Amino acid sequence: IGDIIGIKGTMFKTKVGEVTVLVKDFTVLNKSLRPLPLPKVDSDGKEYDSFTDLEQRYRQRYVDLIVNSQVKDTFIKRTKIINTIRNFLNEKSYLEVETPILQPIPGGATARPFITHHNALDIPLYLRISDELFLKKLIVGGFEAVYEFSRDFRNEGMDKNHNPEFTILELYVAYKDYFWMMELTESLIEKVCVEINGKTKIEYDSKQIDFKAPYDRISMFDAIKKFTGYDVSNMDENELRSVCNDMSIEVDDSMGKG
């Protein structure tokens, strides 16, 4: 980390069995012009010079990767997750495809698109907000199972968990229902968890989550009743607004049941 050198020499083992190199020549390959913000601890146990400022970490991700190993681990895990999903689907003979990023009509989702202009055709084009419609056209065209890891773009709000460009997996299979998709999703998530962590149980936010399939299934109506105490299955719009008001949920007269 920092200065990088290349060495020439002879490999050997030390008396304690550690593999090392007897250096005969070296070359400076890269010189670090500024000291890295590596954390230091003084005699009182106080740590300083840590690279902890969130704004700096996000804007200088290369430094963050050098000094915070857990960030690099996240990058590696992300790649492993994508590869595991891809292998899982390929083993089932699903076809990975690529669909257009620049589209004449943004579709497949309700979102504000980024707009650009095609000079040769003199027409506006949109960065895709979803690849759904093109994948469905492939199903109509005779491919029975297709999927795509795509970069999608939505010109909307932004926060820690909401980025204007993001990677999404979309999968479509002919002649199947959503119960089948539930089973596929369960087995896929379990497979990924085991491949990445070596087990189905993980710790998240001081809680243990077990991704061992199958998972509990519950309808939306039953979930609302379970967690709020209200049975909304037969309520009209006025009754639903009253329930929302009781739970301090902001609504107005323009909102319907959806």
Model-found features: residue ranges?
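Class II aminoacyl-tRNA synthetase catalytic cores and aaRS-like
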Residues: 1-258
